[in-house]
Amino acid sequence: MNSNGHEEEKKLGNGVVGILAETVNKWERRTPLTPSHCARLLHGGKDRTGISRIVVQPSAKRIHHDALYEDVGCEISDDLSDCGLILGIKQPELEMILPERAYAFFSHTHKAQKENMPLLDKILSERVTLCDYELIVGDHGKRLLAFGKYAGRAGLVDFLHGLGQRKLILGYSTPFLSLGASYMYSSLAAAKAAVISVGEEIASQGLPLGICPLVFVFTGTGNVSLGAQEIFKLLPHTFVEPSKLPELFVKDKGISQNGISTKRVYQVYGCIITSQDMVEHKDPSKSFDKADYYAHPEHYNPVFHEKISPYTSVLVNCMYWEKRFPCLLSTKQLQDLTKKGLPLVGICDITCDIGGSIEFVNRATLIDSPFFRFNPSNNSYYDDMDGDGVLCMAVDILPTEFAKEASQHFGDILSGFVGSLASMTEISDLPAHLKRACISYRGELTSLYEYIPRMRKSNPEEAQDNIIANGVSSQRTFNILVSLSGHLFDKFLINEALDMIEAAGGSFHLAKCELGQSADAESYSELEVGADDKRVLDQIIDSLTRLANPNEDYISPHREANKISLKIGKVQQENEIKEKPEMTKKSGVLILGAGRVCRPAADFLASVRTISSQQWYKTYFGADSEEKTDVHVIVASLYLKDAKETVEGISDVEAVRLDVSDSESLLKYVSQVDVVLSLLPASCHAVVAKTCIELKKHLVTASYVDDETSMLHEKAKSAGITILGEMGLDPGIDHMMAMKMINDAHIKKGKVKSFTSYCGGLPSPAAANNPLAYKFSWNPAGAIRAGQNPAKYKSNGDIIHVDGKNLYDSAARFRVPNLPAFALECFPNRDSLVYGEHYGIESEATTIFRGTLRYEGFSMIMATLSKLGFFDSEANQVLSTGKRITFGALLSNILNKDADNESEPLAGEEEISKRIIKLGHSKETAAKAAKTIVFLGFNEEREVPSLCKSVFDATCYLMEEKLAYSGNEQDMVLLHHEVEVEFLESKRIEKHTATLLEFGDIKNGQTTTAMAKTVGIPAAIGALLLIEDKIKTRGVLRPLEAEVYLPALDILQAYGIKLMEKAE
């Protein structure tokens, strides 16, 4: 070891403690030690506390600000290099791990969780000692450091907050409406006081009879449930036994003769249920037995939906659950109950067990948007509270809402033994409960956790081709399937089981592993165990049976802590008929950019393995091959958080941070894949293309092929790669539809006389609810500037030039023949003549026109606003003075330039309209422009933001604010081609049309815009065609070749993006 290594090694046990700034989650405000804990540790002296210094990384969001730590003697610094022990709450970023240090945090690695193995690898490679809070267990067998009660407390407060809003939408005003979310209160005491106030109002004013009885059902009896019940008990309440629930619904409903409720209810009801209330034995002669249920859940039927759910208003889910147990409430059960008019209002899933015991809770929610609505009638998810369905909450970081109290509780316990960790130089120095919590020591796994590599190596997902040296059990003469359930990992029973197998001379292979997701949850594993001698296999079974059923002959060191359940099954033998092994071709795609377009592209590529077995896929890519294509997708973004959010819920997609200006990082990731799909701004494509040429990787973009990229054609060709550009919607699908129509005409010996194309990204009719009938899905500046570009096209042989300032005035009414309900207009889109060259029709077509679509009336209003000066991008004198003015004052400045009194206020539509008329516009035009100006808020007496230096800036600011899509609104894409074909021999003229109409959709709570789909999916199809080697042309190309556009259009249709074609 070099001298620097010796210096690093000396840090361990030096008594200097570091506290990390939490960076993984924006809401994480907890801290392992509060200033008061630090004060006691520092002022107690190193001889007594084991701590000489505490260095705190600065954090503006931590619940206790830096100055409070500094006041008690802590040092504030980003540099923790002097620290031998570093504390956090959640896992730190990998680059924050310093070598030869001790770390303590919740690592979530001891069950070999796949997603956290890179963290463990980093820990081991940096020779770090890791103590996991989750594994610090007291003599009673329970965790010492946990936040369960705080999750329960915050969870129920948050749900009551949402319950008030939901009831109001359903037509009932309740005291819950005044309650805020947990994080809105300065302390737990303040939140409790607010709940008490709600309770007092219920006790004195009552609740509407129409929502009563209001029954809260709590699952489980652990700390989470106790915390939630603690909040519930602040309300006037009565607890009811599960068997008594039906009685609440048969009492006098208090309905008068005219059918109106005449009574109020002055309390709420609670019911605590455990597993015995959720299931019953399949054998009617047998009663519920908890031990039997945990060992053999298959012997029991679920009954919660029959006995409890019909009487539940709010289900507060606090219990652990495993996949081998029946669902508490399935989607089908909820749908059946809904038809019967059940009273279920909402699910408060504090466990945040996604797709777990409550099947339809399909995603975690955020503290600042904690709710979603599931409508079982149409199996749809919504982000609002309006409409039918069940309100669901599943926040996974609830304790941080009471960060002050949670941190105090945590630090009270941690400060009792942090000194031992800070002064530890040898693991043997630690007390037993801390020693058992150390997953690694100086970069080596401790003996209790040596099973982790074994689990990783035998996990088919992680190492399908790298089974451990013992060999797969199916290679042995005698084989069995052993099912183990219990606290296999946190109680280290898995070590004993694997040791027994190996000690007897057997082998094992992990066939299945389902990890318990909480301290109380059990884990479940299936091991294929093999031996070449039947007696050896019998010995293994006997040993495992004794481990599962300890007695005087065999006492497990952990017998008191837990038992495991054991089942023996059959493994397919060598002489049995086996299915032909599936052959898979592995490919990789790197997607650069994590914007809206990325998700549908990533989703398509990640689903290739599934769709490659479908008939249409075999048709396009070859039915003879037995191989399935499996595409591993890497999504790279400058901000890792964006990439992670974009790919959430898509399997086999990896999110990474990548700055394309960092050539080393770009080379690293491009080298790992077969195709790069760049969804970055066009200005970034050249640098990406050069890297692809260097590494001989194909590239796909959805952007126009610019001059810089075109110049790379020969280099790309020499490298044997394809750079496929313009593979989106416009450009993209428009090219492909056009080339198919034109090529079909030429094959039939026809001559294209006229080619016209119209395309627009629009709000759906329901979302076109403003004077412009238009909305922006991103900053409107680009769209407005596009409306000022000059245009050129050919009409009946004449070349028509349109100046940018007259573009909106040139708009003409337009109707799609097959879609007459859409009242549209179009204006020319830049230079249409270049498309005559691209499509090979420049000499034969007398009309070549490409237009942009908008709803009718848009252009007249935009032209008027432009003439009035609302799009003036030069610095405005009033805005540049530094004096803050209101939008109303700015409006007066714009419209009163030529008036005698420039400061004349313009309050309403009528006054604004009159002023516009005075400026030379017609009455109709003025009225519509005035309506738009008022809608945008230009007449409001609020200050113009200081960042607005021009009227154009102010207009864009208001348009972005007022013309944005709300959560449930759909956008729409409409693309329409018309081609007139003349057949010289027959002297007939045919008109061919092709139309694409696509709407955005909401699926599993995720909104995907039509624009994102129609740009992202074609780009992904381009990548797939290159992966499957269906594009043979090399160099820079557009989708103008039949080898691209024919399969691409067919795949688009097979994937659900429909094209309507017609000939007359």
Swiss-Prot record:
Modified residues (Phosphoserine): 458
Gene Ontology CC: cytoplasm
Record-given protein name: Alpha-aminoadipic semialdehyde synthase
Enzyme nomenclature, EC number: 1.5.1.8, 1.5.1.9
Phylogenetic placement of the source organism: Eukaryota, Viridiplantae, Streptophyta, Embryophyta, Tracheophyta
GO aspect biological process, one term: L-lysine catabolic process to acetyl-CoA via saccharopine
Coiled coil feature spans: none
Highest taxon of the lineage: Eukaryota
Family affiliation: In the N-terminal section; belongs to the AlaDH/PNT family. In the C-terminal section; belongs to the saccharopine dehydrogenase family.
Annotated effect of mutating residue 407 to D: No LKR activity, but no effect on SDH activity
InterPro entries found in the cross-reference section: AASS (IPR051168), AlaDH/PNT_N (IPR007886), AlaDH/PNT_NAD(H)-bd (IPR007698), LOR/SDH_bifunc_enz_cons_dom (IPR007545), LOR/SDH_bifunc_enz_cons_dom_sf (IPR043009), NAD(P)-bd_dom_sf (IPR036291), Sacchrp_dh-like_C (IPR032095), Sacchrp_dh_NADP-bd (IPR005097)
Natural source organism: Arabidopsis thaliana
Region (Saccharopine dehydrogenase): 583-1064
This protein's pathway: Amino-acid degradation; L-lysine degradation via saccharopine pathway; glutaryl-CoA from L-lysine: step 1/6; Amino-acid degradation; L-lysine degradation via saccharopine pathway; glutaryl-CoA from L-lysine: step 2/6
Intracellular or extracellular location(s): Cytoplasm
Keywords: Cytoplasm, Multifunctional enzyme, NAD, NADP, Oxidoreductase, Phosphoprotein
Effect of residue 458 to A: Reduced LKR activity, but no effect on SDH activity
GO MF assignments: saccharopine dehydrogenase (NAD+, L-glutamate-forming) activity; saccharopine dehydrogenase (NADP+, L-lysine-forming) activity
Sites of Phosphothreonine modification: 238
Record PTM: Phosphorylation of Ser-458 seems important for the LKR activity.
